Amino acid sequence: MCGIFGISSTKPISNQLIKGLSKLEYRGYDSAGISGHDINSKLVTIKATGPIKNLKHKLSKLKGITTAVSHTRWATHGQPTLKNTHPHLSEYIGIVHNGIIENYLDLKLYLKKKGYVFSSDTDSEVICHLMNYYFNKSADMQSSIISTANSLEGSYAIAAINSHIPHTIYTSCKGSPIILGKGVDANYISSDITPIVDHTKHFIPMDDSEFAEINSTSIKIFNKNKRTIRKPTKVSKINKNQASLMGHRHFMHKEIYEQRTIIQDMTSRFVGKNKILPNIFGHNTDKLLENIEHIHFVACGTSYHASLVAKDWIEQFTKITCTAEVASEYKYKKINVLPKTLFVSISQSGETADTISSLKKALKLSYTNTLAICNVAESTLTRLSGMNFLMNAGPEISAVSYTHLRAH
């Protein structure tokens, strides 16, 4: 999992990019990079291995840039080296990518035959060369990103800039999240809402196979036929102070010390004098859950361990039987769903790829209903699930998940 953050503004943005990437460091922290338009519309790129702070001493190269894309990486294809660090470049094009391109070897062979030279070991580099190839054919960036997306198999969130089209970012996603932020004299793209709320509460989540063209004054969303898609703007309920250190030494320190307050707050909101309050999963959900006899938990990592605890407690105190599965296993298994079974997905971010894939599979099966236990109201998981339980435990920026394990 990697993090993408981009800004198109009327003012210099280099420090904002570093701050935004820091909010995404839980998504990857083995290397980071930024690419933007200089005053002559040429692409200027900086990269560094290791944590995001290693980029800071290179920021002078980005002086004055107002439009750029940035990336923090957790390596999947290729070692965490400088040559494999995003952004990747191809003549006019610079791209950042989150996801896995399953047919990248076929695309790489095709592009090599067209004369393209590869400088990294990543699957992501095929995207920038492919986009450059299509742009050379069409001289139209919208057509180029559409043709590129049509050629890709797998999951992706892409943000791209073009030296021939200054002050503009192009983006698309499939199976990996992209959030668009609407500001004043600036617009934003991000892998999640956390970096955006520092600048604006107004956002638009993109859906799979949508495309967007962003500059400092406008956001245009369109489909593969270039037809404009009109989507409502949402307002985030996240308090930007929740995503700040608030006097703590670092975010791990903050998240350790705020556990007690968050659990007390959750208890006061969801637990009455003698029982859990009704409808905590939404309107009339208490009636929907009355006849549930089985629960199927699916999650990854820390959330999976929380589901094991829930399984033991539920079976100890009720007659409901439970199973708990790792999402990466569930999505490939043959599943026999018993009658009156509730599917429960658990994810702090609501963007865990395997958990989302499992939920999409579950929606095609005969579960009585689906419930997401999540911390982010604006996430893919909550949008897809029939019911939601929002922890409101504050954003996770440290990757250790102390608070969110307890909240789950």
Specify the residue positions occupied by each region the protein language model found:
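Conserved small/polar residues in nucleotide/adenosyl-binding loops
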Residues: 403-408
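Short acidic loop-to-helix transition motifs that present clustered carboxylates
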Residues: 126, 196, 324-333, 351, ...
